[in-house]
């Protein structure tokens, strides 16, 4: 076999022409210290705040402290494989998460990575976790109701779309239950829900997901999970990641509801990161910017004006108190940021009043504008009546010689308290809530035994569904003054029949 010189020269010529001299440049730093989920990196002079940094084994970190000669990096994952001297590369982008309809029905971590074993999330849309809150011009005042399905809330501390309503109470008082009931009640309301579990036990979040699946609520819900076993940086990022997912729907003219469960553990995770980074501690060892930590998150919940799509993002932050102390640092911060609070009490919970809402100090600063007319009219004096009843009940313990008017008020207060009780995972449509509260405030329950109230309410609802479905459908839409006579006549007819049946059974 003979080799011709011209062939060799032509092959060499082709190879030389194909040869490219592109040089890949990357900004590289080196790990000088690692431990407790943080790393100090030397180099990377042009690194941005909150920029994603890549370690050799694929683990990501976030630039948290930009100092004179090094960078404090929080590691978004396990830090066992990161060693001193390792290279760290810039990515040129800040922390961002996938957003869009592809996330609905999924359980993801704080970086938007799936945890439910249903395969990758098919979306090419990403948003940074830290975004500026909408300005004054782009907003509109809250005017549409967001029904929780809970009589005690929708009547006395109503929530509107775009509002921030704090749920606050000791552990074990039913805070998560209220949030989950609200999510379940959004079925058919064109509202995407996001549940963010921060620092919870993995079993607790699994229980919430199971209940949402059983009730069919997972069809319109995203769950963002940062459990107690996750590193503090992931617990810190989780609410911002969930908020970015909700903002996608808000900015596209849709309605979204986000639950942060809970922001006490979020503040603790941030405190841990700050102290490890040697930031100066303040009150209760929290860093000085812990107020801004929550205000910049909750300000992103908004009702957008019509020119900007008229979408909304409603936030239900949860705060856990210690022995009912609402004057601690984090509770007072979040109370001052939000548009009202629902305060849950251990004593009420243990007395069987569930949801265990303390009517006296629970308020909604904007939701009243969003109540439907019927609910506003029937529950107008409810809060005052209950407050007076509580006062009288405390006074009545000292003596039994009460006049008729005081006795009547106590009887009505007891029955009103009874009708506001509601079992977990049983949210009520607003028209049935109006019926129950109308019956309580107009004396239809006064002659019943306390034990009969729940059965009476159940039968009243069944009666209206069977005999007056068209009247029920009109309650949320029409003015109360136009339908009150018909509702009153129907309730009178039911009460008459109920009284006769009760007499026959005796």
UniProtKB/Swiss-Prot annotation:
Q: Where does the record place the site Required for activity?
A: 362
Pfam families hit by this protein = ATP-synt_ab, ATP-synt_ab_C, ATP-synt_ab_N
**Cellular compartment(s):** Cell membrane
A GO cellular component term found in this entry reads: plasma membrane
What are its E.C. numbers?
A: 7.1.2.2
Q: How does it sit in the membrane?
A: Peripheral membrane protein
Q: Which GO terms describe its molecular function?
A: ADP binding; ATP binding; proton-transporting ATP synthase activity, rotational mechanism
Main EC class the enzyme belongs to: translocase
Q: Which UniProt keywords apply?
A: ATP synthesis, ATP-binding, Cell membrane, CF(1), Hydrogen ion transport, Ion transport, Membrane, Nucleotide-binding, Translocase, Transport
Known catalysed reaction(s)? ATP + H2O + 4 H(+)(in) = ADP + phosphate + 5 H(+)(out)
Report residues binding ATP: 169-176
Spell out the subunit comment. F-type ATPases have 2 components, CF(1) - the catalytic core - and CF(0) - the membrane proton channel. CF(1) has five subunits: alpha(3), beta(3), gamma(1), delta(1), epsilon(1). CF(0) has three main subunits: a(1), b(2) and c(9-12). The alpha and beta chains form an alternating ring which encloses part of the gamma chain. CF(1) is attached to CF(0) by a central stalk formed by the gamma and epsilon chains, while a peripheral stalk is formed by the delta and b chains.
Function per UniProt: Produces ATP from ADP in the presence of a proton gradient across the membrane. The alpha chain is a regulatory subunit.
**Which NCBIfam families does this entry report, sorted A to Z?**
atpA, PRK13343.1
Q: What protein family does this chain belong to?
A: Belongs to the ATPase alpha/beta chains family.
Q: What is the recorded name of this protein?
A: ATP synthase subunit alpha
Query: What is the organism field in this record?
Result: Symbiobacterium thermophilum (strain DSM 24528 / JCM 14929 / IAM 14863 / T)
């Amino acid at each position: 076999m003979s080799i011709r010189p011209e062939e060799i020269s032509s092959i060499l010529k082709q190879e030389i022409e194909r040869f490219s001299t592109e040089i890949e440049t990357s900004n590289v730093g080196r790990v000088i210290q690692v431990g407790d989920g943080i790393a100090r990196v030397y180099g990377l002079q042009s690194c941005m705040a909150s920029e994603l940094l890549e370690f050799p084994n694929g683990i990501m970190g976030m630039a948290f402290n930009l100092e004179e000669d090094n960078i404090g990096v929080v590691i978004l994952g396990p830090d066992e494989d990161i060693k001193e001297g390792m290279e760290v590369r810039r990515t040129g982008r800040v922390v961002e998460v996938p957003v869009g309809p592809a996330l609905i029905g999924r359980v993801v971590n704080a970086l938007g990575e799936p945890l439910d074993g249903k395969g990758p999330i098919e979306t090419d849309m990403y948003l940074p976790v830290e975004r500026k809150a909408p300005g004054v011009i782009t907003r509109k005042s809250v005017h549409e109701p967001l029904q929780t399905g809970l009589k005690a809330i929708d009547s006395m501390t109503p929530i509107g779309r775009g509002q921030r309503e704090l749920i606050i109470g000791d552990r074990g008082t039913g805070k998560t239950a209220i949030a989950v009931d609200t999510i379940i009640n959004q079925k058919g309301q064109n509202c995407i829900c996001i549940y963010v579990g921060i620092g919870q036990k993995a079993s607790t979040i699994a229980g919430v997901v199971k209940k949402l699946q059983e009730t069919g609520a997972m069809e319109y819900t995203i769950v963002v999970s940062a459990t107690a076993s996750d590193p503090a940086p992931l617990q810190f990022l989780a609410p911002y990641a969930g908020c970015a997912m909700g903002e996608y729907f808000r900015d596209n003219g849709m309605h979204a509801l986000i639950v942060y469960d809970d922001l006490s553990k979020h503040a603790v995770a941030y405190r841990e990161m700050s102290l490890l980074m040697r930031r100066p501690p303040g009150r209760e060892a929290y860093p000085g910017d812990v107020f801004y930590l929550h205000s910049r998150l909750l300000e992103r919940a908004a009702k957008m004006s019509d020119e900007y799509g008229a979408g909304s993002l409603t936030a239900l932050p949860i705060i856990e108190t210690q022995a009912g102390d609402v004057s601690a640092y984090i509770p007072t911060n979040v109370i001052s940021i939000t548009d009202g609070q629902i305060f849950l009490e251990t004593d009420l919970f243990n007395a069987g009043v569930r949801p265990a809402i303390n009517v006296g100090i629970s308020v909604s600063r904007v939701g009243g504008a969003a109540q439907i007319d019927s609910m506003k009219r029937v529950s107008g004096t409810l809060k005052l009546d209950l407050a007076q009843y509580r006062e009288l009940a405390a006074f009545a313990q000292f003596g039994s010689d009460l006049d008729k008017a005081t006795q009547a008020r106590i009887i009505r207060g007891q029955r009103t308290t009874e009708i506001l009780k509601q079992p977990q995972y049983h949210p009520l449509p607003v028209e049935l809530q109006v019926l129950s509260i109308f019956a309580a405030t107009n004396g239809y329950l006064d002659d019943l035994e306390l034990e009969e109230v729940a059965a009476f309410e159940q039968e009243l609802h069944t009666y209206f569904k069977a005999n007056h479905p068209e009247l029920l459908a009109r309650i949320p839409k029409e003015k109360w003054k136009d339908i009150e006579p018909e509702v009153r006549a129907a309730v009178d007819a039911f009460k008459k029949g109920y009284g006769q049946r009760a007499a026959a059974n005796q």
